[in-house]
Swiss-Prot record:
Belongs to the major facilitator superfamily. Nitrate/nitrite porter (TC 2.A.1.8) family. The modification Phosphothreonine is found at residue 521. Root cortical and epidermal cells. Not expressed in new lateral root Primordia. Detected in shoots. This is High-affinity nitrate transporter 2.1. It comes from Arabidopsis thaliana (Mouse-ear cress).
Length: 530
């Protein structure tokens, strides 16, 4: 095969995925832009990778993937580190059921605000700074758990640690800027799923660390405190790695590209406006509130549920509870892959149907879990429920990147915050008072999942249609270029600030499924007045 030369991104020719990668420095966080740079993976016109090699560390795409999911997983470990140790902590601090429930609400409420902020940080400063600084700044709060002495301190510290869950937004934003739209479901699902797996890892890790420390001579009430130094140090290590090895965009870091004039410097007010005025944003906020939201709520109660209901030992209850979080290893990527597969044949309409089916099934399995009377039945129902909820998360963020190109960060932040808000609301309604037993709470949570999934039928893209309605027949408004180009005014278009949106629109034409035209309009010929 002949050598390929030329500027990558000028066309799909000349990008074979076999050229030597030399443009990006591993040692320095400052990555210099080089228009002649070649990538280790084949890329599209936006320099996004068109293939996903899971066991590769190719820079910048796969290196970013691994840094992103590991840092997010670290935050999950610390946020839910207290959950498997609650049977010990509640005796030490004299916690009531309401205290434990309030702490669960607090642990996921903090990131409602921080995820909104992280969305803006990603849009304006880049995901590398957002992820690295949040992970490192939250480390002191993790260490602080070792020094709490009462219920108020326990609730407050769990609230503060929960801020770090905003790394989910940087994770999903980062993947959406590094990988092509045809594989974004799988990539987003894998990154977030493996990150969420931290909720399962901590169910195994913290009881083991606690037991090791206790056997080394510490008392039970001292051992659980020392155990929190493990996730605290993980925060510091991952923050340093992300800051030094991460990269905002395929071509370099955002600040460097803005100075070179290759990336438009946007304004917060405008990206916020386009995010909040797009009705699809709020539907996905609700949907994610009852997929990711219920997963977070379950992480807080599932170990205690098995410990109390079936009178299991602490480590046994933790092992079973870990299965819920560990299902993220394959369930969330499977949801994203299912969405990509459906889109290959049915476009965006296939993605929407996939989301509705998976999330509704998860809700029904949740109802079954709440009504299970034997340990075996409860475990089976829990595993199926976890697979449905987590696959629905993957299917959701296989669609979110298409809602807006310009306001991707803000919309990702709002959707992610919806997950935390849904978790806090669910925890408050069903698991923080004596009105419901844990079994009843799980049952009603399942009913809420089924009901809150119905609004997905209202999501309609003029260029692709909805679950029940076809796309627009308008030759202008029914195009991808018009949908994404309409986020820029005429003055901004004259400055060519919308070119990134047009390139994205060209690559997103595959979401039309079998309706895609055989002869697509080249991106350079797309009118500037869309």
């Amino acid at each position: 095969m002949g050598d390929s030369t030329g500027e990558p991104g000028s066309s799909m020719h000349g990008v074979t995925g076999r050229e030597q990668s030399f443009a990006f420095s591993v040692q320095s966080p400052i990555v210099h832009t080089d228009k002649t740079a070649k990538f280790d993976l084949p890329v599209d016109t936006e320099h996004k990778a068109t293939v996903f090699k899971l066991f590769s560390f190719a820079k910048p795409h796969m290196r970013t993937f691994h840094l992103s999911w590991i840092s997010f997983s670290t935050c999950f470990v610390s946020t839910f580190a207290a959950a498997p140790l609650v049977p010990i902590i509640r005796e030490n601090l004299n916690l009531t059921k309401q205290d434990i429930g309030n702490a669960g609400v607090a642990s996921v409420s903090g990131s409602i605000f921080s995820r909104l902020v992280m969305g803006a940080v990603c849009d304006l400063l880049g995901p590398r700074y957002g992820c690295a600084f949040l992970v490192m700044l939250s480390a002191p709060t993790v260490f602080s758990m070792s020094f709490v002495s009462d219920a108020a301190g326990f609730i407050t510290v769990r609230f503060m640690i929960g801020f770090c869950l905003a790394t989910f937004v940087s994770c999903q934003y980062w993947m959406s800027t590094m990988f092509n739209s045809q594989i974004i479901g799988l990539v987003n699902g894998t990154a977030a799923g493996w990150g969420n797996m931290g909720g399962g890892i901590t169910q195994l890790l913290m009881p083991i660390v606690y037991e090791i420390i206790r056997r080394c001579g510490s008392t039970a009430f001292t051992a659980w405190r020392i155990a929190f130094f493990v996730p605290g140090w993980l925060h510091i290590i991952m923050g340093i790695l992300v800051l030094n090895l991460g990269q905002d965009l395929p071509d370099g870091n955002r600040a460097t590209l803005e100075k070179a004039g290759e990336v438009a410097k946007d304004k917060f007010g405008k990206i916020l406006w386009y995010a909040v005025t797009n009705y699809r944003t709020w539907i996905f906020v609700l949907l994610y509130g009852y997929s990711m939201g219920v997963e977070l709520s379950t992480d807080n109660v599932i170990a205690e549920y098995f410990f109390d209901r079936f009178h299991l030992k602490l480590h046994t209850a933790g092992l079973i509870a870990a299965c819920f979080g560990m299902a993220n290893f394959f369930a969330r990527p499977a949801g994203g892959y299912a969405s990509d597969f459906a889109a290959k044949y049915f476009g965006m309409r296939g993605r929407l149907w996939t989301l509705w089916i998976i999330q509704t099934a998860g809700g029904l399995f949740c109802v079954w879990l709440g009504r299970a009377n034997t340990l075996v039945t409860a475990v089976v129902a829990m595993v199926l429920f976890s697979m449905g909820a987590q696959a629905a998360c993957g299917a959701t963020f296989a669609i979110v990147p298409f809602v807006s190109r310009r306001a991707l960060g803000i919309i990702s932040g709002l959707t992610g915050a919806g997950g935390n808000f849904g978790s806090g609301l669910t925890q408050l309604l069903f698991f923080s008072t004596s009105h419901f037993t844990t079994e009843q709470g799980l049952t009603w949570m399942g009913v809420m999942i089924v009901a809150c999934t119905l609004p997905v039928t209202l999501v309609h893209f003029p260029q692709w249609g909805s679950m029940f309605l076809p796309p627009s027949t308008d030759p202008v408004k029914g195009t991808e270029a018009h949908y994404y180009g309409s986020e820029w005014n005429e003055q901004e278009k004259q400055k060519n600030m919308h070119q990134g949106s047009l390139r994205f629109a060209e690559n997103a034409k595959s979401e039309g499924g079998r309706r895609v035209r055989s002869a697509a309009t080249p991106p350079e010929n797309t009118p500037n007045n869309v």
